């Protein structure tokens, strides 16, 4: 194509549904490219979206050195948090703020959405504070994510992308688990799309 606007990149879960794209690239590769563009010092990308969570380790050039995904169930994803918010009759903005000032360090023992929901209902019946329950949920997701980071050999600096990066309580809890501060761009939700656009620009310039 002769113009950048004429190049179409496909990435993510819907990439196979688009038949007229110029090239198909995995979202792992696109997230790595986008993250490196936003901050070249980043060596580990934590992406928690609606359908999956993934941790990607980058080399100094922004190429994928290693990665691990959780895409088998909703556990540890944005969908998990959405369902827990619905159970607690709160929206995601409220959930983001809740848990920041918890008093009781509650532990949610199951990451299975069905069993975790039962635990939350039981905690509500016990008149546990909302902030404490939300912190327990944040801690469960953060622990699972930190375990993924350990598996992939995560190293600083860490960047968090995806819609869940807007959840203040979860970000704080994850930072505590990792022992470091997460880099979060105001374009965190667009990181994969940004990477795809950069690959498209490369095609145009060749």
Per-segment meaning from a language model:
Residues 13-14, 153-177, 188-189:
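Glycine-rich phosphate-binding loops at beta-strand->alpha-helix junctions
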Residues 116-149, 189:
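Adenine-nucleotide phosphate-binding core of ATP-dependent small-molecule kinases
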Residues 27, 175-194:
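Conserved phosphate-binding/catalytic loops in two-lobed NTP-binding clefts
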Residues 75, 82, 86-124:
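Conserved ATP-utilizing enzyme core subdomain
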Residues 1-7:
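Short, small-residue-biased leader/transition segments that mark boundaries at the very start
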Residues 78-82, 185-206:
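Glycine-rich phosphate-binding/hydrolytic loop that grips phosphoryl groups
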């Amino acid at each position: 194509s002769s113009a950048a606007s004429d190049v179409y990149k496909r990435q993510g879960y819907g990439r196979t549904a688009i038949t007229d794209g110029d090239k198909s690239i995995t979202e792992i590769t696109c997230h790595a490219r986008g993250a490196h563009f936003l901050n070249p010092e980043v060596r580990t990308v934590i992406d928690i979206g609606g359908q999956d969570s993934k941790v990607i380790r980058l080399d100094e050039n922004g190429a994928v050195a290693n990665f691990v995904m959780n895409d088998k169930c909703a556990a540890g994803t944005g969908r998990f948090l959405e369902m827990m918010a619905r159970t607690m009759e709160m929206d995601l903005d409220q959930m983001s703020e809740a848990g920041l000032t918890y008093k009781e360090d509650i532990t949610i023992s199951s990451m299975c959405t069905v069993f975790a929901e039962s635990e939350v209902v039981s905690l509500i019946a016990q008149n546990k504070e909302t902030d404490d329950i939300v912190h327990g949920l944040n801690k469960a997701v953060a622990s699972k994510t930190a375990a993924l980071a350990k598996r992939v050999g995560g190293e600083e600096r860490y960047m968090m992308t995806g819609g869940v990066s807007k959840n203040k309580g979860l970000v704080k809890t994850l930072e505590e688990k990792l022992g470091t501060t997460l880099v979060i761009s105001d374009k965190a939700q667009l990181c994969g799309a940004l990477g795809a656009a950069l690959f498209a620009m490369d095609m145009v310039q060749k």
